[in-house]
């Protein structure tokens, strides 16, 4: 997508595939800083620290990590150990495991430069496929937005949780791709953006939409239910980190509560995700999808702009405060209007 008149993707290759570049999402929306990495270890670290985040983008970064590993590994044992480390960097987003398997399969039985070239091609194909999938998802959801607009005759009011835009993918996004396509079609919209504690990914969504010229309003996480009760939400659209075979959806913690409120208020609730997010090995998700728990500091500290204009972190809870930082929750399929 365009930022400051410059076209930027969630991740892209450079130097003939020797390195990849990506915006450091731990610095956004305060600073746009582009990272350049060329080793599997560096990309594993970027995935773990959420410099890259969002299930499809984690998958793409994992694909490049696997491709770099195919170039680096001197033995089959080192290759297999490295692939396992990449796949386990984040446990909930199934796209990561899927992408690693696909690159490993493309390079299986090969060695040296041939293996490296085949792995790089697989990583490139995964990235291009992600863009195509997201554009298709955008077309589907744009038709839902258009239908709602024609029915109501006013700007469509959409609520979204976390960030499922181009920052969470290679480009366009999943949940937000429909908004971008609808904007191209001239359909008026107003977007409610959940702040999405504790990592405040809603700030990324607000930044994305503002850069794209789509009207949006940042709200506290717990405000969505009230807005639905008051008839101020026409549609809810979210992304997904893993979808079980029965349609249960793992997504950023808080998604389940939005789905419950939408169900109670009769507001359509949609999930947007590529096929790589579906885990066909799981019959259901509520009891089976592994849910990541992250550092207590994500809850007890928060980033912002200090009086000197620089990004700073402040503590909002004491060191003796008991904390449990659950990163995802599972929304049962019965609460979901449709998966796009």
Question: Where are the predicted features?
Answer:
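Ligand-binding beta-strand-loop-alpha-helix segment within the catalytic cores
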Residues: 95-157, 189, 193-236
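Short, hydrophobic/aliphatic alpha-helical segments
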Residues: 35-51, 156-160, 309-325
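Histidine-anchored nucleotide/phosphate-binding helix
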Residues: 172-184, 259
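Conserved phosphate/anionic-ligand binding catalytic regions in large, soluble enzymes, centered on
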Residues: 49-62, 96, 163-171, 324-340
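Short beta-strand segments
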Residues: 23, 61, 65, 97, ...
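Helix-rich catalytic cores of soluble enzyme domains
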Residues: 149, 154-176
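Conserved phosphate- and dinucleotide-binding cores of soluble alpha/beta proteins
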Residues: 188-189, 194-340
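Long amphipathic alpha-helical segments
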Residues: 2, 9-113
């Amino acid at each position: 997508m365009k930022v400051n008149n410059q076209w930027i993707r969630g991740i892209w290759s450079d130097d003939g595939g020797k390195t990849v570049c990506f915006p450091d999402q731990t610095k956004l929306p305060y600073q746009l800083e582009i990272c350049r990495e060329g080793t599997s270890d560096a990309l594993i670290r970027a995935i773990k620290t959420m410099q890259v985040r969002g299930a499809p983008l984690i998958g793409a970064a994992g694909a490049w990590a696997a491709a770099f590993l195919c170039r680096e590994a001197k033995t089959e044992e080192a290759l297999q150990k490295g692939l396992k480390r990449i796949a386990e960097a984040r446990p909930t987003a199934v796209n990561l495991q899927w992408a690693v398997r696909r690159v490993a399969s493309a390079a299986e039985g090969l060695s040296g430069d041939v293996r490296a070239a085949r792995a790089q091609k697989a990583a490139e194909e995964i990235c291009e496929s992600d863009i195509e999938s997201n554009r298709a998802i955008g077309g589907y959801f744009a038709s839902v937005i258009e239908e709602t607009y024609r029915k109501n005759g006013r700007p469509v009011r959409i609520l979204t949780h976390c960030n499922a835009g181009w920052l969470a993918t290679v480009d366009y996004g999943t949940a937000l791709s429909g908004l971008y396509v609808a904007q191209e079609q001239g359909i008026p919209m107003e977007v409610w953006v959940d702040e999405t504690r504790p990592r405040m990914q809603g700030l990324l969504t607000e930044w994305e939409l503002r850069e794209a010229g789509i009207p949006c309003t940042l709200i506290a996480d717990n405000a969505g239910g009230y807005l639905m009760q008051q008839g101020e939400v026409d549609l809810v659209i979210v992304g997904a980190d893993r979808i079980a075979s029965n349609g249960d959806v793992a997504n950023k913690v808080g998604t389940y509560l939005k789905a419950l409120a939408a169900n109670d208020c009769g507001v359509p609730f949609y999930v947007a995700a590529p096929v790589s997010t579906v885990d066909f090995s799981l019959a259901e998700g509520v009891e089976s999808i592994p849910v990541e728990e992250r550092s207590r500091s994500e809850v007890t500290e928060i980033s912002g702009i200090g009086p000197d204009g620089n990004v700073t972190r402040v503590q909002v809870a004491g060191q003796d405060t008991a904390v449990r930082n659950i990163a995802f929750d599972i929304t049962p399929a019965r609460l979901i209007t449709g998966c796009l």
